[in-house]
């Protein structure tokens, strides 16, 4: 899967109010789409989460992680960003008119 190294300082909070731990960013990466999986293994991993657990996953790679699949990391690209927020959409619109 494509990944980017973390540039920001990353904190863990157990309660959402105070910092519990400073995480070592040299071991943290931001995953990007699209990922590539062995279809049969990935399908089986997703089917194992049906019907109720599939809605609680944190991304399309999580079923593969939960199933113990080997997931190789490759260098991602800053220009490959997901449109999730209004700010992301504005960034995309700006790219279109350039």
Positions of PLM-derived features:
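Anionic-ligand binding region
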Residues: 1-30, 36
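Conserved alpha/beta core of the MobA/IspD/sugar-nucleotide pyrophosphorylase nucleotidyltransferase superfamily
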Residues: 29-98
């Amino acid at each position: 899967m494509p990944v980017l190294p973390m540039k920001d300082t990353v904190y863990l909070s157990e309660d959402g109010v105070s910092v519990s731990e400073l995480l070592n960013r040299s071991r943290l990466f931001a995953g990007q789409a699209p990922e590539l999986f062995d279809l049969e293994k990935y399908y089986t991993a997703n089917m194992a989460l049906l019907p109720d657990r599939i809605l609680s996953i944190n991304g399309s790679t999580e079923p593969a992680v939960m199933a113990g699949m080997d997931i190789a990391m490759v260098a991602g690209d800053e220009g490959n960003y997901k449109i999730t927020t209004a700010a992301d959409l504005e960034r995309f619109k700006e790219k279109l008119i350039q």
